[in-house]
Amino acid sequence: MDTKLYIDGQWVNSSSGKTVDKYSPVTGQVIGRFEAATRDDVDRAIDAAEDAFWAWNDLGSVERSKIIYRAKELIEKNRAELENIIMEENGKPVKEAKEEVDGVIDQIQYYAEWARKLNGEVVEGTSSHRKIFQYKVPYGIVVALTPWNFPAGMVARKLAPALLTGNTVVLKPSSDTPGSAEWIVRKFVEAGVPKGVLNFITGRGSEIGDYIVEHKKVNLITMTGSTATGQRIMQKASANMAKLILELGGKAPFMVWKDADMDNALKTLLWAKYWNAGQSCIAAERLYVHEDIYDTFMSRFVELSRKLALGDPKNADMGPLINKGALQATSEIVEEAKESGAKILFGGSQPSLSGPYRNGYFFLPTIIGNADQKSKIFQEEIFAPVIGARKISSVEEMYDLANDSKYGLASYLFTKDPNIIFEASERIRFGELYVNMPGPEASQGYHTGFRMTGQAGEGSKYGISEYLKLKNIYVDYSGKPLHINTVRDDLFQ
């Protein structure tokens, strides 16, 4: 699974001639190589995006949407190829890979359908013959930095709205999953995206990451990743005042009240915790269950978790962690929880797998009880199939514990009580609250958060607006001589 760079309409090697090995998280073996782009490669990609901007902007949103829609059709027609790449480089089970490609197709179609809805306004001026035309224009050059946990979905979520709104793009995917991104770029190119409009760069973030985000020609940076990386980007990009769309860390509370439909809550919890092996910004990372049902709920949760199959992506219920570093970090945080007095209710270690999967980066579904609210299990984003659980006795306690986090992206609540539902909608300080259902809900939802989760957002009409700058044109069409208070009229007599 080797990938190339795509710069100014050409598939090329890195100017350094260097490549980096890519490992399978399922087997731990090398499965391909990606190009190690240099600063010169970054410059060429950004210059190409700059040169292509005006022609792409002038094409108009309707014509741009036709190209984007063709890309969607090509992806849909050849989707099995993308599913296999996701399984190979990310390790997702086939069910999750198919679900991700469903999302790719849906998102691209959703954004393409917005072509005729990018409207502005005409505002009355200070008199009847003065008007203010307010309309939206593209920012210009967009740098899109995509993560490994949804290697295709996040590419679609960023590329489609950025291109529809007339921006040109330099895309840099995670070094762990460059193949999915390259495949999607090839479909956009095949669909007719002109040269320079979309450029594709791969390489270590430590080598070109700072350079690309602090580049003086970059107008907007959209990134999904860790809070630490987002903070670094904010610092580096501030010198040029680039617009930022940052979707960062999460620590989702999963709240189960005593009247909850237990089957629905458990089914959703299995998804919210073990989807993508817990490597999701909206993954359930903290479990709060009412004391009246805690023992029954936890017993069933443990038994269900015990039944999950790991290993071959074609048959597994849950995949591996992305790399050795993630595996080590997960082991360390579980050991720290043990040492602090927490109780491992299930899991807590790597599974014993045979055959090609014995060297994969798998970790058992892990449930931890009796952990302190201020411990890492409840405060730090774990990004693994690990969850801490606590009893709650009142709604006030539930709200307080849920909000006790530096993050504020997703949250989950299971109850039949309408009063709690509507009160929680106000009290829970998170960008997303899923009530009696799993997330994420459709492309038309706005994906955003509070606190250290980032800024701006993606999805829906609000997400499209993030890629557009509001511009104002002030017009006086009276044809009469102007009177300006601070300029004497007699100067013109």
Swiss-Prot record:
Catalytically driven reaction(s): D-glyceraldehyde + NADP(+) + H2O = (R)-glycerate + NADPH + 2 H(+)
EC top class named in words: oxidoreductase
Entry keywords, A to Z: Coiled coil, NADP, Oxidoreductase
E.C. no: 1.2.1.89
PROSITE patterns given in the database record: ALDEHYDE_DEHYDR_CYS (PS00070), ALDEHYDE_DEHYDR_GLU (PS00687)
Top-level taxon in the UniProt lineage: Archaea
Binding of NADP(+), residues: 146-149, 157, 172-176, 204-210, 225-248, 281, 381-383
Entry's pH dependence statement: Optimum pH is 7.6-8.
Keyword Oxidoreductase: yes
Activity regulation note: Inhibited by calcium, cadmium, copper and mercury ions. Stable for 2 hours at 60 degrees Celsius but activity is decreased to less than 50 percent within 20 minutes at 80 degrees Celsius. Two folds activity enhancement in the presence of 1 mM glutathione, DTT, or 2-mercaptoethanol. Complete activity inhibition by thiol-modifying reagents such as p-chloromercuribenzoic acid or p-hydroxy-mercuribenzoic acid.
Coiled coil spans: 70-92
Binding residues for substrate: 149, 157, 281
Pathway the protein acts in: Carbohydrate degradation; glycolysis
GO biological process: Entner-Doudoroff pathway through 6-phosphogluconate; gamma-aminobutyric acid catabolic process; glycolytic process; protein homotetramerization
Family that this chain belongs to: Belongs to the aldehyde dehydrogenase family. Glyceraldehyde dehydrogenase subfamily.
Protein purpose: NADP-dependent dehydrogenase of the nED (non-phosphorylated Entner-Doudoroff) pathway with highest activity towards glyceraldehydes (e.g. D,L-glyceraldehyde and D-glyceraldehyde), to a lesser extent towards D,L-glyceraldehyde-3-phosphate and glycolaldehyde, but no activity towards aliphatic or aromatic aldehydes.
Name this protein carries in UniProt: D-glyceraldehyde dehydrogenase (NADP(+))
Organism of origin: Thermoplasma acidophilum (strain ATCC 25905 / DSM 1728 / JCM 9062 / NBRC 15155 / AMRC-C165)
Source organism phylogeny: Archaea, Methanobacteriati, Thermoplasmatota, Thermoplasmata, Thermoplasmatales
